Amino acid sequence: MIIQGKCHTFGNDIDTDAIIPARYLNTTDPGELARHCMEDADPTFAGRVQKGEIIVAGKNFGCGSSREHAPVAIKAAGVAAVVAASFARIFYRNAINIGLPIFESPEAAAGIKAGDEVKIDAGKGEIVNLTRGETYPVAPFPPFMQELIAAGGLMPYVARKVKTSV
């Protein structure tokens, strides 16, 4: 899996309330959630982000309350991947479950600046900053996780597996 795009940067401890504020939790419509994605961290983000772009953040991205709305909002906004120095474990699981690729790399989080163009090679385990000519390590995704992401998340992945096994 290769993902390439322009980066939007955020700091440490971006919690799920900054990703999608609690006042929007009464909706499950992905399009509506996308319109408010990152609203409390950067009110202009949802209007600027383009399909295929990448969020890069510091430590503990997705901390706070466990809400599937957070990765859904990010994915629905068109974000192709999230790179962070570290993730809150529940956010990590929720993101993978809905098919949002996320990559933990403290080196990439420190080196990538807003507007940089990067290429993530999930199989090879590297992030190349095409703007700065730097390469950062990232743990490669095992093949089954690449399949799960490519399927669009856990539910579509399981549905395919069940369908092909019958």
Curated annotation (Swiss-Prot):
GO biological process: L-leucine biosynthetic process
Disulfide topology: none
MF terms (GO), sorted A to Z: 3-isopropylmalate dehydratase activity
EC number(s) on file: 4.2.1.33
Keyword annotations of the record: Amino-acid biosynthesis, Branched-chain amino acid biosynthesis, Leucine biosynthesis, Lyase
Pfam families attached to this UniProt entry: Aconitase_C
InterPro entries listed in its UniProt record: Aconitase/3IPM_dehydase_swvl, AconitaseA/IPMdHydase_ssu_swvl, LeuD, LeuD_type2/HacB/DmdB
SUPFAM superfamilies: LeuD/IlvD-like
Catalysed reactions, semicolon-separated: (2R,3S)-3-isopropylmalate = (2S)-2-isopropylmalate
Pathway per the UniProt entry: Amino-acid biosynthesis; L-leucine biosynthesis; L-leucine from 3-methyl-2-oxobutanoate: step 2/4
Top-rank EC class of the record's enzyme: lyase
Residues spanning the signal sequence: none
UniProt subunit comment: Heterodimer of LeuC and LeuD.
Summary of the function given for this chain in its UniProt record: Catalyzes the isomerization between 2-isopropylmalate and 3-isopropylmalate, via the formation of 2-isopropylmaleate.
Family statement: Belongs to the LeuD family. LeuD type 2 subfamily.
Protein name stated in the entry: 3-isopropylmalate dehydratase small subunit
Gene: leuD
